[in-house]
Amino acid sequence: MAFFADQKSDPKRGFRFILSIGGIPAYTIKTVSKPGVTVSTIEHQFLNHTFRYPGRTTWDSPISVTLVDPVDPDVARTLLNKIKNAGYVYPTDPASSQQSMTKDVAVTTLEGCVIEQLSGDGTTAVERWELKNAFLPKVTYGDLDYGSEDLSQITIEITYDWAELRESGPVDPSQALRPERVASSDSEGKSTARG
C-alpha cells in the first residue's frame, strides 16, 4: 500500500530538520545538504566483455550549510572564532606566520556536526547523521545589496571523513531549539561567551 493511502504513514519532509554545530543556534540554520557516498567502479576487460568491480568508497564531502546572520548572537563572529581557535592567526608579525591549523584542533573546535530529520510532531529524529572528523574549510560571508531587503546570509562548507546514519530516537528540544551560548571575542582576542 502506498504511504499516501495510510493516514498513519508520514513521509520524511525536507523542512523538518535540526543541524547541531557547537555554538551555532539551530534557528539560524536555513539549509543543509545531507551526506552522500560514492563507490568507485573498476573495469576489467576480457575479450569482448567488460566486467565491473566495486572500488574505493568515498564520502561526498563537503556538505553545504546556509545560515542567517543575526546581530545577537553574532554568527559571523562565532564562525571566525572557530577558524581562529582551530589555529589561524592574523599575519601581523613574523611569529604569527609560524602557526598553522591541525586537523585535531580544527575538528575539536567545530564541536561535532549532527543532522537530525524530525518526525511530524518533532519529538523523534527519524534520521540522524553524525559527521565524523568534521571541520570548517570554508566560510563565505555573503553579499550586500542596496536594492535588497533580504536577511544577511552566510554559507559554510563542512568537510568530514565519513558519516554514520544512527537509529531513530527522541529529540531533546531544550538542546536543539534554544539559543546556544555563542562565543565572541573581546578586544584582546580572548574568547568570552554570551547568550
PLM region descriptions:
Residues 1-195:
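Glycine-rich, low-complexity intrinsically disordered segments
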